[in-house]
Amino acid sequence: MNSVRKTISSRILYVICMEVQYFGRYNAFLTVQNTSATVKIPVEISESEVEIMDTNIMKRNECLAKTVIKGLESRNMSGYYAASKEEALKQALELIPEESTIAMGGCVSAREIGLVEALEKGNYNYLDRSKMSPRESLMAAYDADIFLSSANAVTNDGILINIDGNSNRVSCIAQGPRKVVFIVGINKVCSDLDSAMKRARNVAAPVNAQRFDLNIPCRETGKCFDCKSMDTICCQFLITRFSRHTDRIHVILVNDTLGY
């Protein structure tokens, strides 16, 4: 690895580090590209080097989260940083009083940190929408104490971006439930509103199209076609740039890759 460091730029090395951290393994491919070809060169990385990389990435993620939290606070929203899924679960439960009524959209991130399981086992009134009709679920969610969600993207300065097909999720974020708790992986942080919208439309939407087996172009191509299909998942776009109601919106930023 040291010999490789001498021949590649720090920027390319950083990309390799991110790939190692993401895949959680001790080898990676260095991608070298010019105008005529792209070549992948296997690179071996020791366990100690991976630990150093992971530490540096974690420090960067924490700094980034602090920037986002500052932006959220300037918009009358609360932000928190969790260094792990376990910390995220602990923080989420601190925001959810026992015996409260909790609703949720199809939030993969909440499941990934173990929050749904904890609510089902604990002293909470967790509304399982799979046991209700869509209309019953929506009406119950509007009157809930807590609504759980993730975001399709969040900007460095604290703007939340969400796209919805049936609009149950974005409508509950906008109004209704007394408190909204977001579980957001650091992978969803984007530099600005434009890049956040691109992520929502070209990453989150195509993946969810696969997840729900929708008959729309992005399911086949992996990118947005701005379609008007009856199955389109991009019916409503919600940009949350400020919360008029203090203590309503809480965002937990997690040092992990969560959701889509």
Q: Model-predicted segments: where are they?
A:
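Conserved phosphate- and dinucleotide-binding cores of soluble alpha/beta proteins
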Residues: 142-260
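Short, Lys/Arg-enriched N-terminal segments with co-localized hydrophobic residues
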Residues: 28, 38-52
